[in-house]
A protein has these predicted regions:
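Catalytic beta-strand/loop module used to bind and position nucleotide/cofactor moieties
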Residues: 10-13, 17-18, 22-191
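Basic, glycine/proline-rich low-complexity segments that contact nucleic acids
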Residues: 1-11
């Protein structure tokens, strides 16, 4: 993949030494993009197995508070039903960039070749998301529990000035805070 976009139509660029991939995950099958986005983040974390990585709800992976990876899932209605695409972009190798935010690079803490990361990520995505009649259904509860465990390393969410000591995720991947379902991380900070 050589082009794309981020959330809210933000500019997305592929820097040298980076990884960018897109998958048509569901076509004519019901799957929620929010849940898929979290599953994509979990697949990245599982493919690397590094404790230093943090999953920042809803779609980023961080190293020491700096963005390493972004995940975007988007659904569109098509003639056969719904088509859902998952996109993942990650900074594998240190490179010069002109980003507005601090970026992290995987090679600062771990060396992996592009092909090896790609192979591992495909395996993890397949294990989490493959749809076939002869396989058990997608394990939403198991994925939710793993994502929540990874999110705990960020601290507690602050939303509208309130810090929440208890938070959860629903089956759509929305953050549950005080009985409210939040679908956008733009106004959430972690303390």
């Amino acid at each position: 993949q050589t082009s794309g976009r981020g959330r809210r139509q933000r500019q997305w660029t592929s820097i040298e030494g980076g990884y960018a991939g897109s998958w048509i995950v569901a076509e004519g099958v019901e799957i929620n993009p929010g849940h898929l986005q979290l599953s994509g983040g979990l697949a990245v974390l599982n493919s690397l197995g590094l404790e230093q990585l943090t999953l920042k709800w809803p779609n980023d992976i961080l190293i020491d508070g700096k963005k390493l990876c972004g995940i975007l899932a988007e659904g569109r209605n098509i003639q056969q039903g719904m088509r859902v695409v998952l996109g993942i972009g990650m900074n594998l190798k240190t490179a010069i960039h002109d980003s507005d935010f601090e970026m992290a690079f995987l090679d600062e803490i771990y060396e992996i070749e592009f092909e090896e990361f790609d192979r591992r990520l495909h395996c993890e995505l397949a294990s989490l998301l493959e749809f076939r009649d002869d396989l058990p259904p997608v394990r939403h509860e198991e994925i939710r529990n793993q994502v929540l465990e990874k999110m705990k390393s960020l601290g507690l969410p602050r939303y509208n000035g309130t810090i929440f000591t208890d938070f959860d995720l629903n089956e759509r991947g929305e953050l549950l805070l005080g009985g409210e379902a939040i679908d956008d991380g733009e106004y959430i900070t972690w303390v």
